[in-house]
Amino acid sequence: MSQIKAILVAVDGSPNSDRAVQHSLDMVASGFATEVHFLNVQPGLRGAIASFVSREQIDSYHRDEGNKALASAVGLAGKASVSAQVHIGVGRQGEVIRDFAKKLDARMVVMGTRGHTGLSGVLLGSVAQDVIAHVDVPVTLVK
């Protein structure tokens, strides 16, 4: 099996997300990958709410919520003694995941099949479908 450098794991704090994190950590432990990046994507604030709060407050909110969602993944990586980079993006999930995969030169995206998206999603979940449609690297879905 050939080794890849970077894996990008989309993290939302859901049980399926935790399983995706564990899968990526197992790939690092087995020598399949050398680097793992955890990414949480926060939805952008729009409309009236964005006009009543400062940019600093919005950034702080996204950072706090992103760190909450990433906490479990960071804990799992620590237990596995794997060093992981954490990232918080803002915007449409599929687009942000695609852009981070390119930016990090990730050779694989790993994510849960359904997470915290309001609706449970149909079949794979809307975010997973969006990512599969837009990234140029293999996508591993974990349920």
Q: Which positions does each model-derived feature cover?
A:
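Small/aliphatic-rich secondary-structure junction motif
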Residues: 2-52
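Gly/Ser-rich helix-loop-strand patches that form or flank binding pockets
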Residues: 99-143
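Amphipathic, non-transmembrane alpha-helical secondary structure
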Residues: 18-26, 71, 98, 102
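Short beta->alpha linker loops
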Residues: 53, 88-92, 114
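Structural beta-alpha unit
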Residues: 2, 75-109
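General small-molecule cofactor/ligand-binding pocket signal
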Residues: 37-39, 85-89, 140
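A short acidic, glycine-rich active-site loop
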Residues: 55-68
